[in-house]
């Protein structure tokens, strides 16, 4: 079991590392490539587009050919794309490398969740996904610090050499440590539980959890996207104050994420999901009424706590009905989360909604819709929480 957890954590970490590692070098990259920082900020959207593209195909391929091949290829693509970025001499080549980085990270991301669905029952899966969320929160704090230390002595290309090395490590783990987890077949007693209706992507329960997780990701990405404007322009924080504040909010996310597995031993998953949405609603009301920086910071802290306590549980429930199609389900969740959150941020920008109102709107909208879905759509107990998976290969 340890090998699956190690490999899943490593596969997921490529995604946030690809976002946060290079940001500290953005001014120098822009200067060397004769591009403005504003032009290179599109690299974030290009990276997400690459992830979404990979997710369109990676899940189905993982269900048909296995998790291990997709993990290896994804890591290889991420490694190669990182080298391409390091060799870029102009903006378009750099953006091409960023797109391919997203493709590699997206494939690995999908496989990681499919592996956890294959190997863990629902109760343990919810705990592990909460821990995974906590570990993922460490990356936005450590990656810029690591990038800063690297750039004290080396050029910006070294940031992408480091990411390439991460791709190599993940590839080696996938090649030599990871065992195939794709179910070869189900026992006769489980066939009815994994019928096409039970594993349909338009299953009412799956759609409800897809909506909840997509709205939750939209909340946290809106917070990340709006935070520079809120903290530095509206609240008057310096860059140093901004960095410290974001580190503290990430710390809150880590503490709550690492505490959630213990809370699952005391409370039902639905209770934690309701607490999560209650925190979102409270945060939205707090921010709408805030007149001081202290109250605003308290509202932002509630956002991090709310996401951390409920997201892993909701993801676990969403993947629960799928044994033979875990890859496709994971892909669908990833695509919806990436595209849904990007669509909201884009629409809000087009409509000229301020950063604060953008955040308040998604907080209140997410909480109301999600609470209604949690109460109205409950898990189908006829679907097994976990099936015993006979592995196709042990290599």
UniProtKB/Swiss-Prot annotation:
Where are the membrane-spanning stretches? Answer: 4-24, 42-62, 69-89, 93-113, 131-151, 158-178, 217-237, 247-267, 271-291, 295-315, 328-350, 355-377
The GO molecular function terms of this record are:
transmembrane transporter activity
Q: How does it sit in the membrane?
A: Multi-pass membrane protein
Family annotation (Gene3D superfamilies)? Multidrug resistance protein D
Protein name as annotated: Multidrug resistance protein MdtL
GO cellular component entries: plasma membrane
Q: Which UniProt keywords apply?
A: Cell inner membrane, Cell membrane, Membrane, Transmembrane, Transmembrane helix, Transport
Q: What is its main location?
A: membrane
Its lineage opens with: Bacteria, Pseudomonadati, Pseudomonadota, Gammaproteobacteria, Enterobacterales
- Entry's localization field: Cell inner membrane
Has keyword Coiled coil? Answer: no
> Its family?
Belongs to the major facilitator superfamily. DHA1 family. MdtL (TC 2.A.1.2.22) subfamily.
For whether the record's keyword set contains Cell inner membrane, the answer is: yes
| Alphabetical list of CDD domains matching this protein | MFS_MdfA_MDR_like (cd17320)
Q: Which domain of life is it from?
A: Bacteria
Q: Which organism is it from?
A: Salmonella schwarzengrund (strain CVM19633)
């Amino acid at each position: 079991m340890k090998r699956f957890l190690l490999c899943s954590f490593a596969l997921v970490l490529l995604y946030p590392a690809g976002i946060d590692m290079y940001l500290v070098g953005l001014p120098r990259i822009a200067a060397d490539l004769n591009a403005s920082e504003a032009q290179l900020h599109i690299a974030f959207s290009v990276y997400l587009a690459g992830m979404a593209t990979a997710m369109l195909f990676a899940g189905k391929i993982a269900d048909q050919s296995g998790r291990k091949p997709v993990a290896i290829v994804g890591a290889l693509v991420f490694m190669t794309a990182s080298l391409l970025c390091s060799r870029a001499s102009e903006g378009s080549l750099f953006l091409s490398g960023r797109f391919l980085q997203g493709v590699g990270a997206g494939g690995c991301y999908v496989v990681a969740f499919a592996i956890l669905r294959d190997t863990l029952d629902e109760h343990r899966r919810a705990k592990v996904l909460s821990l995974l969320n906590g570990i993922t929160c460490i990356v936005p704090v450590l990656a810029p610090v690591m990038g800063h230390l690297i750039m004290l002595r080396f050029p910006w290309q070294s940031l992408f050499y480091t990411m390439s090395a991460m791709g190599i490590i993940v590839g080696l783990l996938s090649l030599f440590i990871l065992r195939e987890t794709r179910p070869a077949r189900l026992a006769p007693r489980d066939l009815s539980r994994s019928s096409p209706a039970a594993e349909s992507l338009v299953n009412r329960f799956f759609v409800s959890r897809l909506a909840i997780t997509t709205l939750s990701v939209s909340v946290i990405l809106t917070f990340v996207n709006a935070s520079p404007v809120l903290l530095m322009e509206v609240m008057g924080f310096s860059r140093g104050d901004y960095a410290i504040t974001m580190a503290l909010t990430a710390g809150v996310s880590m503490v709550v994420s690492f505490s959630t597995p213990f809370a699952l031993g005391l409370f039902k998953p639905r209770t934690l999901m309701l607490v999560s949405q209650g925190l979102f609603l409270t945060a939205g009301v707090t921010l709408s009424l805030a007149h001081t920086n202290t109250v605003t910071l308290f509202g932002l802290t509630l956002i991090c706590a709310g996401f951390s306590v409920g997201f892993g549980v909701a993801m676990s429930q969403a993947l629960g009905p799928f044994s033979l199609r875990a890859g496709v389900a994971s892909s669908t969740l990833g695509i919806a989360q990436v595209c849904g959150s990007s669509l909201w941020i884009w629409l809000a920008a087009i409509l000229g909604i301020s950063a604060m109102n953008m955040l308040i709107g998604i907080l209140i909208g997410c909480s109301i819709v999600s609470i209604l879905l949690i109460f109205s759509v409950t898990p189908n107990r006829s679907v097994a929480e976990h099936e015993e998976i006979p592995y196709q290969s042990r290599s």
